[in-house]
A protein has these predicted regions:
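PLP-dependent class I/II
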Residues: 1-166
């Protein structure tokens, strides 16, 4: 199974699945009953793009772009953030997880980030029924430029020091 959502266009929601025919039929029936079928025009556009481009070369370029942006995020975090805040070292994908100390009011931290136009997502958004609000945030480096990432991380870093100390 795989997706073209992040490699061709964010939000595309078109993917692929290989496997035994009976398994694929069951998955397709479940998908059609729960989320409906993807518009045929979207699927045809993806098929045309895949017939037109060198997808492997495209993936290599996407990986380079995201690695550059990830490195910018990590470098800026290490430069600006409180030493009490932890950041995962991504091994792929487009997101890093930042974990705050347990004694920090993460709702207030989140609001302070939003007030300063720094977009982060609370970890509870990725948990069933909002459970596990916890003290972690997802940071994305897909859309912003390297300069925007650096500026955002400088602001975020200052806020981590304000909320957590050095």
């Amino acid at each position: 199974a795989g997706s073209y959502s992040k490699t061709l266009s964010a939000g595309l929601r078109v993917g692929f699945l290989f496997g035994p025919e009976k398994v694929i039929e069951a998955i397709q029936a479940l998908k059609n009953n729960t989320a409906g079928q993807m518009p045929l025009v979207t699927q045809k556009v993806v098929a045309k793009v895949l017939d037109t481009i060198d997808y492997d070369a495209h993936l290599e370029n996407v990986r380079k772009v995201y690695k550059t942006k990830c490195d910018a995020l990590l470098n800026a975090f290490n430069k600006y953030a409180s030493s009490k805040v932890k950041l995962t070292q991504p091994t792929g994908g487009m997101f890093a997880w930042m974990t705050m100390p347990e004694d920090v009011n993460c709702d207030d931290f989140f609001e302070a980030c939003m007030d300063r136009n720094v977009g982060i997502i609370k970890c509870g958004a990725f948990a069933a029924d909002g459970a596990g609000e916890g003290h972690a945030f997802r940071l994305s480096y897909t859309v912003p430029t390297v300069e925007e990432i650096t500026k955002g991380m400088e602001i975020l870093g200052a806020l981590t020091k304000e909320f957590c100390g050095e």
